Amino acid sequence: MDKFLIDVIVEIPKNSKIKYEYDRQTGQIRVDRILFGSESYPQNYGFIKNTLDWDGDELDCFIFADQPFLPATVVPTRIVGALEMIDDGEIDTKLLGVIDCDPRYKEINQISDLPKHRIEEILIFLKTYKLLQKKTVIIKGLKDVCWAKKEYEICLQLMKDYGHLSKDQFIQKMQILHPEHYQK
């Protein structure tokens, strides 16, 4: 399979405790909250423009890199897999990628090429970062690049078909049309 390259727009820099979130209505990145606990984001975290995931937000992506990037920075990213999870009852996919313009990452093309410890950092972060908010996050599993690409294509289509809806309208409609993606 050819490399799966996409541009990811950074919302949250590596090591930040600030939860920024892209606001599709205004096109701005807003401070959503400060993380409730002692955790910080283990890698850069962003979204893929023109996609819509089942949670009503753009498709998310962790970007493995040695440096933190400022919010709104576009990072060329090579997708190496995905993480399927349920966040507060909604499917919330996280693509996993590496910075594509850093030679230190040129040999990483799939999740198994990454140090296991780095993957564990993300898994532990996602399992614990909402505990003090009394919200549940369930990790369903790691997925390969082919799965990630299919999910990306689904999210592109969801944006084309339903991007005009508000987040609440989208979720209400999808809970009826695709209840398998929701546990509420």
Swiss-Prot record:
Keyword tags: Cytoplasm, Hydrolase, Magnesium, Metal-binding
Family per similarity comment: Belongs to the PPase family.
PROSITE patterns, sorted: PPASE
Localisation: Cytoplasm
Residues that bind Mg(2+) 1: 55, 60, 92
Organism: Mycoplasma genitalium (strain ATCC 33530 / DSM 19775 / NCTC 10195 / G37) (Mycoplasmoides genitalium)
Protein name per UniProt: Inorganic pyrophosphatase
EC number per UniProt: 3.6.1.1
Domain of life: Bacteria
HAMAP family: Inorganic_PPase (MF_00209)
Gene Ontology BP terms: phosphate-containing compound metabolic process
